[in-house]
Amino acid sequence: MAGDVEGFSSSIHDTSVSAGFRALYEEGLLLDVTLVIEDHQFQAHKALLATQSDYFRIMFTADMRERDQDKIHLKGLTATGFSHVLQFMYYGTIELSMNTVHEILQAAMYVQLIEVVKFCCSFLLAKICLENCAEIMRLLDDFSVNIEGVREKLDSFLLENFVPLMSRPDFLSYLSFEKLMSYLDNDHLSRFPEIELYEAVQAWLRHDRRRWRHTDTIIQNIRFCLMTPSSVFEKVKTSEFYRYSRQLRHEVDQAMNYFHSVHQQPLMEMKSNKIRSAKPQTAVFRGMIGHSMVNSKILLLHKPRVWWELEGPQVPLRPDCLAIVNNFVFLLGGEELGPDGEFHASSKVFRYDPRQNTWLRMADMSVPRSEFAVGVIGRYVYAVAGRTRDETFYSTERYDITEDKWEFVDPYPVNKYGHEGTVLGNKLYITGGITSSSTSKQVCVFDPSKEGTVEQRTRRTQVATNCWENKCKMNYARCFHKMISYNA
C-alpha cells in the first residue's frame, strides 16, 4: 500500500565512505585545506579531519579564524609525526617504532586523536625495559598522557624493577622527589629486601648533592625494622647520611630498640615494622599426613596454585593451635613425637616472624595441651582446656607477650577438648567440644575484666567466679569445628 514505509540499511556504507575519502585523497580531488608544518605542506579534506579529530572539528565548525582559511600553519609538532597521524585518519593503520613514536605521540596529542595516543601507549608499555624506562617516563610526562591504565602499568613495571632501575644514572636523574616518595610508600616493593631500598635511596641522594635536603623526609618511608640488625650496623650506621640526618639516627635508634625488645615486638605497631605486602597472604602451618606422619612444611600461597615453602621449627609437632598478633604467628602445643615413638601432648610455643622469616622458641605453657582453644586479647594469648593422652582438663592460662611467661587464670567451667574459640569485643568465646559425657552445644564467654585473684588462678581451682558466663547454646553439638568473629 502507498502508506507503508520500510527502512533499509547498508552493510557497506561506512566502508564505502572511508574508501571514497581515500580515493579522493589519493587522486588529489576536492582537497580543501593545506596544513603547513615546518617546511612541509599536507593537503586534506576538512570534512574528514573534522570527523576524525576533535581538534579539527572545533577548528572548522566553531567561530575560529582558521574555519575559512585554505592554508593553516600548525606549530608545536613535527612534519614526520603529523604525516603518520594523517595517514591514520585516512587509512586507519599506523606503524610505530622507538624512533618515530615520540613524534607520532606528540602529533596525536596535539590534534586530540585519542586512538593513536592509545596505540602509542600500548606500544611503549610493550617495549619498556630497564634501558628505556626513563625515556618512556619522560615521554609520557612531557605530553601529559592521561590514558586510563597507562600510569598504573608504568608504575607496576617501576615497582617490579625498582632496585635495578635505581642503579641507572638516567633513571636517577629523572626520578623526582615526589615520585620516589610515592614508590617507597608502596607495599608492592615487598620483593626487595629493605636494605636494598635504603641503598637505592642513597644512590638517589648521591646523584645530586642538592637532594640531600630531602633526606629526613625520604628516610621516614624506609622501614628499618624490616632489616636485619647486621644490615643496620654495617650498612646504615656507616653511611655519610647517618651523620648528616638527625631523622635517620632517630629511625636507627628506634629500630635497635625494636631488635632488642624481642618479646615486645608483636605489640610494637609502627610504620617501621609494618610488613610490605600489597595484599593479605595465605599460609599453611604444619599438619598430618595419614594418622602418624607429620608434615612439617610451612607453605605460603604466592599466587594461584603456586606455594612457597618457608622454614619451620625443627620439632615434629602436629595439629598446633595458632594465634596471630600483629602479623607474628604463635604456634602453641599440639602433639610431638616422644622418645617412645608415640605422640604426646606438647607445651611448646614457637613464634614466627615473617619480616625476618625466622622462628623463636618462647616460654612453654604451664601444662602440655592438645585439642584446646586459643584467643588473643590485648597483650595476652589465652589457652583454654584441652587434653593429654591420659586426661582432659579445664585449666586456662594466658601468655604475657611482653614478659614471655604463662600464668593460670580462672578455669573453664568443665573439662573439655576439641572445642573452638574466637575473640569478639575483648571477650573470648568458646563453643562446642567434647566433655566427659558427650559432644557439647555449649557457648561460654570469658571476660578478662572479671578475672579472679591470683590465689584463685590455680590449675585445678573450683572457685566459682564471674569470669566465665554461659550463653545461648548452639542448635547443634559440635567438636573439632572452626569459628571466626566477623567485624570484631
Curated annotation (Swiss-Prot):
Domain of life: Eukaryota
A single BP term in Gene Ontology: nuclear protein quality control by the ubiquitin-proteasome system
Record localization: Nucleus
Residue intervals of the BTB domain: 31-98
Pathways involved: Protein modification; protein ubiquitination
Keywords for this protein: Kelch repeat, Nucleus, Repeat, Ubl conjugation pathway
Domain BACK intervals: 133-237
The keyword Cell membrane belongs to this UniProt entry's keyword annotation: no
SUPFAM superfamilies recorded: Kelch motif, POZ domain
GO CC annotation terms, alphabetical: Cul3-RING ubiquitin ligase complex; nucleus
Kelch repeat segments: 328-379, 381-426, 428-473
Repeat listed as a keyword: yes
Pfam families assigned to the protein according to its UniProt record, in alphabetical order: BACK (PF07707), BTB (PF00651), Kelch_1 (PF01344)
Chief location category: nucleus
Subunit structure: Homodimer. Interacts with CUL3.
Job of this protein: Substrate-specific adapter for CUL3 E3 ubiquitin-protein ligase complex.
Protein name: Kelch-like protein 15
